[in-house]
């Protein structure tokens, strides 16, 4: 794929902005509402967004895959693929919204809190709003308009601050939920206009009259989308089922609020690597369709390399500075979430490897492998949570998720080696562990009170790479994305 490095830097930058905005939202909402109402808010929003992420992304992702395969070879098919995916997605989302609205009393009953019913009903409107914005996100992924994607993602982050925090301040929990409806609607409107401005410019073949648009098989989209949708369903449940089991088993809004804070901040490494999956699926779809096995292996190897180099310091520093990060985002009232968050953050590292490599397999059309692995992981996670939460509380929930994530990481690494003929470098892992251990030890020697931990963390993050460079692990090729961005060479749409 051309300009892989520059596109990755753009998308990573947008993910950083988006997630920083997200943590501003979480911090502000948590402080405004307090632990109990923040726990209720977390339950409502997490469940609703989980549904749209897992059910609503299968068809758009399939659209993205097929757009990527034909965008250079036969761009006249772009409108047909888009129209068929839009039709299927609209039918699905309207149905899911109706079912969720009608099921709200049952969901609240299962959570032993009937007062959640009106909030769940209101949150059902998040589903079509979120789906509308996400549809264009995957549309632009398939067309490799990565720079436009990055701009829209940043806009969405800022819109979340404006709407969610503003509405929470004036209207409480209902306002927070309403903000989740308004923010993606704004982004959808911008993306809709951008489609008219940019798509015809880069792909003149898409100017065909409506009657001339080539038909595209809905069956082909659905055959790819259903196992992918199940994968997203099982994966999202693995990352969130512990929160619902904490609520159901412990029946404490306060404990739920603490755990929601722990897992929200603990997911930072995963969110930053999400940009890699955005590029990886369409890139591997394209190289697989072209039967370019050498380029496919190169992309997977490069992704593994990025995971090794970047994931170790992120997870290590987040664990080292957990108390300070929690205090920064939520204040002293959430200090009791420190130990669960440290354990959960380690699990997020394992789960990030699983998620990124799953999209490499999905891009190659091997969608049933991640689907099956995630199903096994979900069953194991539920069983461990039910066993651990009554005995160990929040620590048990975090430990259960981490153990399940470790098993999933091992499984996906085996599948990746088998199907792409690539594997993790044992020497690179060993050197990264050495560097991570060094910065973890130094973290407790450098200033960490108040906001000094941010400066200390930056120094240690740079020091990690300096150490790898010193021992010969970090090469010039590893630094090429940053060099290309600074030099301005290459372009990404």
Task: Give the ranges of each region predicted by the language model.
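Transmembrane helical elements of multi-pass membrane transporters/channels
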Residues: 6-22, 156, 180-187, 191, ...
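Membrane-interface junctions at transmembrane-helix termini in multi-pass inner-membrane proteins
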Residues: 129-155, 345-376
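Helix-loop junctions and terminal segments of transmembrane helices
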Residues: 27, 57-73, 141-142, 203-204, ...
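Signature of the first transmembrane helix
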Residues: 3-61, 97-101, 126, 161, ...
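Alpha-helical transmembrane segments of polytopic membrane transporters and translocases
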Residues: 25-27, 39-56, 87, 227, ...
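Interfacial segments at transmembrane-helix termini and the short loops linking adjacent helices
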Residues: 104-123, 253, 301, 318-349
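Membrane-proximal transmembrane or re-entrant/amphipathic helices at the cytosolic face
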Residues: 444-493
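Hydrophobic alpha-helical transmembrane segments
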Residues: 121, 151-200, 375-381, 394-415, ...
